[in-house]
Amino acid sequence: MSRKVTVIGAGNVGATIAYTLSLGDIASQIVVVDINKEKVEGEVMDIVQGTSFREPISVIAGDYSDAADSDIVIITSGIGRKPGQSRIDLAQTNVNIMKDIAPKIAAVAPNALYVIVSNPVDIMTYVFTKVSGIPENQV
């Protein structure tokens, strides 16, 4: 099977999703994108070393151009909720992050199926759909 999956965000959730994908037969290529290049490179090295006995799979720390023609894109980017922080305060910070990501990934992977994992999920999904122009049936 040849399926390309991109994970945007190499934090705890994104790195765990990328690792889990690397263990199964869901993807033949996994691209992990994060604004923190050192973090994403370290996470990808861990994944590659932890899956060395699996069938050949390509796992790379990349950028949006590497995500071109992805079949599935999973967006996990965002700031975690801090103690005492309201859902609205969290939403505003993460909306700004989503507004930056959405047009970049939509430009290179317009036919992908998108999974939004960033919190608050309902708001982030709405923002992604509006900013990216990706049809709702792909999100």
Question: Predicted segments — roles?
Answer:
Residues 23-29, 133-136:
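Conserved S-adenosyl-L-methionine
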Residues 33-70:
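Conserved N-terminal Rossmann-fold NAD(P) cofactor-binding segment
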Residues 77-79:
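Conserved NAD(P)H cofactor-binding loop of Rossmann-fold oxidoreductase domains
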Residues 86-139:
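Rossmann-like NAD(P)(H) cofactor-binding subdomain of soluble oxidoreductases
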